[in-house]
Design a protein with these regions (language model features):
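C-terminal functional module detector
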Residues: 1-135
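Carbohydrate-binding surfaces of carbohydrate-active enzymes
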Residues: 46-72, 81-82, 95-98, 134, ...
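Flexible loop/turn segments at secondary-structure boundaries
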Residues: 177-178, 295-297, 323-329, 394-400, ...
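Feature activates predominantly on carbohydrate-active enzymes
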Residues: 218-425, 429-435, 440-453, 494, ...
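Active-site neighborhood of glycoside hydrolase catalytic domains
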Residues: 400-406, 410, 414-521, 526-539
Length: 647
């Protein structure tokens, strides 16, 4: 009953994700809909055609720790080569189906899951959806409109535009010049089509792609139009970002091999005919990455940015400092990376009062040099992504305190955090010496990151030390503050003044509301939506990032199936269905909701591969939340488009 109330997000989310499935040895029992949800989340199915479209290869990956014993009954007009199949845990199995000429866009493979029993104690009957010709490269049925995020308007047309060696690029607007290389580079490297660029359509014998000024105020900075026919592609925008996003849509309409890292060979490089008009819903479409708990190479940060740009996300929130590691080089304070970037070991289990922590005994550390950061910032800028750096304060500062213990309430000694969670030791709010330190750090941050916002955290700052600290209590009396919450607000406001003085704006987590929000601050609402509602009603810019919906370090499905992760369950369907505009806001108040962001905290995410595994496809869904208005979203259609993008 309570699950029907959206306010109780965790409970409803859990109920949505097969919590009523019982597992005993290898036997699964439960209500049929929960069993099907379990299987849907466990299996990844990809198809391809071979032998002149007479044989379908079906690669099935079982991502769960549960085996599935399958009896195949039929598959439309195709003949399965196997009748009995076991999908072992965490492994891939290949099925083969034969037919005279596999032309249909979709097939249904019907099977009985022999170790999954419904409430009537009968084996579960399950239908696997297999993709046919619509998902094969170089065929007459290639014309699929698999753009994510979904465009504002897409009118399907007959025919297709085929790139060939005679195709020409017509550049009529200089705003398209920089974005254009993201198309021509892939066509040259991957498709072996080094297309010529010219300024007019004179002396053109074949088809062409023309980039022109739209002169349409409704498109804003990021909107675009694309008109595709067999003879030409017309790309219209008024700003560089608009042309860039148009090119991202064109790339998604091409065969998926266009995203290969090496030369790809297909029958043709075609794009289905259509008229597209596209404008984003929100100006802020963000993805976060915590590098404080675990560090990732520069090459992966660039890949992360590439994936964001492909999906028209435009803000990368880079969480650079934590209790467990300081990851940004500060030249005035080199000890921050000499000492603060290294922890002596790392906890490897989920500990509690009843379960002691288990540690790996291995030192861990590293940081990004300022030259590396400049390189990444420039890389993001080329892809129309602004990086928002986070230096978390006054809490989550244990790595800094281990370096400079005099900045804490007790004076130390401190050590860089080795376990996850919240530490009582934070910056001493009554110590005036913390401000020169903060300002030194921020001045170097300002020079590295040209964006208007700097994130100062403000979250999870225990007041335990402040309550017993003479300096903090003296500061409360001196400023005539009510309590330690107002003391934190004093710290945030003082930092905000320094930011504003240097031409920057402050953004922080929703705890900065406690004790009174800084006057010009923007807020990220992570503890549900209440903080965002309060801030929007007060006229503050708000980014919605509630943990129930968009924390991608949370489990994607059953905690029994997936590797150790944070939080509870945050399923793809639940994420996709989220609307960042709270119903409690008036139309005018809703204008203060500037966008949405997904967060990836990395306590249990050690490698780049794990980051991708946890972030996607849910980050893909968040991209659509941020770009596409609710009336243009459709869950089933999204799944179809997503399946194609997995290729």
């Amino acid at each position: 009953m309570f699950a029907r109330e959206r306010s109780d997000g965790y409970l409803r989310n859990a109920l949505l994700d097969h919590c009523f499935v019982e597992l005993l040895n290898d036997t699964i029992s439960g209500e049929e809909r929960w069993l099907k949800k379990l299987i849907n989340s466990s299996l990844d199915i990809r198809t391809r055609l071979i032998n002149n479209n007479t044989r379908m290869v079906v690669d099935v990956t079982n991502k769960s720790s549960i085996p599935y014993h399958i009896h195949i009954t039929q598959c439309d007009n195709l003949k399965p080569e196997q009748k009995e199949v076991t999908l072992s845990p965490m492994s891939q199995t290949t099925l083969f189906l034969n037919g005279d000429d596999i032309k249909s866009p979709q097939y249904t493979l019907r099977a009985s899951i022999k170790n999954a029993f419904n409430t009537e104690k009968k084996p579960l009957e399950y239908a696997f959806r297999l993709r046919g010709m619509d998902y094969m490269v170089g065929t007459e049925s290639q014309n699929m409109y698999n753009i994510i995020p979904a465009p504002r308007s897409l009118e399907e047309k007959q025919g297709k535009f085929i790139f060939n060696k005679e195709t020409r690029i017509i550049l009529k607007d200089k705003n398209a010049e920089a974005p254009l290389r993201f198309l021509t580079d892939r066509l040259t490297r991957i498709a072996q089509l080094p297309l010529k660029i010219q300024n007019s359509t004179k002396s053109i014998s074949g088809n062409y792609v023309v980039f022109s000024r739209a002169n349409d105020p409704t498109l804003g900075n990021e909107g675009y139009k694309i008109n595709i026919s067999p003879e030409q592609i017309q790309v219209l925008a008024d700003k560089e970002a608009g042309f860039f996003y148009a090119i991202q849509s064109l790339l998604q309409l091409l065969p998926p091999e266009i995203y290969s890292n090496t030369t790809a060979y297909t029958n043709e490089w075609s794009i289905p005919a259509a008229n597209i008009t596209d404008i984003p819903q929100f100006e802020y479409r963000g993805l976060h990455l915590d590098v404080g708990r675990h560090l990732y190479p520069v090459s992966f940060i660039k890949k992360y940015i590439d994936l964001m740009s492909m999906q028209k996300m435009n803000r990368f929130h880079w969480h650079l400092t934590e209790d467990q590691g300081w990851r940004i080089e500060i030249k005035k304070h080199p000890k921050l990376t000499e000492i603060g970037s290294m922890r002596k070991e790392t906890i490897i289990n989920r500990y509690s009062a009843a379960i002691p922590g288990i540690y790996d005994g291995t030192p861990y550390g590293g940081f990004y040099t300022q030259e590396e950061i400049k390189e990444i910032v420039a890389y993001a800028k080329e892809r129309y992504i602004t990086i928002i750096p986070e230096v978390d304060l006054p809490g989550h500062m244990l790595a800094a305190l281990a370096t400079y213990p005099e900045l804490g309430c007790t004076g130390g000694p401190y050590e860089v955090g080795t376990r996850w969670g919240i530490y009582d030791d934070v910056l001493c709010a009554g110590n005036e010496n913390i401000y020169p330190f903060i300002e030194d750090v921020l001045l170097e941050v300002f020079k590295l990151f040209p964006g208007e916002y700097v994130h100062i955290g403000g979250d999870e700052c225990p007041k335990t030390r402040w309550k017993s600290c003479p300096k903090c209590q003296s500061k409360i009396k001196e400023l005539k503050l009510k309590d330690e919450h107002e003391l934190q607000s004093y710290v945030i406001r003082r930092v905000e003044k320094f930011l504003n003085k240097n031409g920057k704006k402050l953004i922080g987590w929703d705890e900065i509301l406690e004790g009174g929000i800084a006057p010009n601050a923007a807020l990220m609402s992570w503890r549900g939506v209440a903080g965002g509602i309060t801030a929007a009603k007060s006229g503050h810019p708000v980014i919605m990032t509630p943990n129930t919906y968009v924390y991608l370090d949370h489990y994607q499905a059953s905690m029994d199936i997936y590797p150790l992760a944070n939080g509870r369950i945050c399923a793809l369907e639940w994420t996709y269905g989220y609307n960042p505009i709270p119903k409690e806001l008036t139309e005018q108040e809703a204008k203060h909701i500037k966008g949405v962001q997904a967060n990836v905290w990395t306590e249990y995410i050690k490698t780049p591969e794990q980051v991708e595994y946890m972030a996607y496809p849910r980050a893909n869904a968040v991209a659509e939340i941020g770009w596409s208005s609710p009336e243009h979203k459709n869950w089933e259609d999204y799944l179809d488009r997503l399946q194609y993008q997995f290729k």
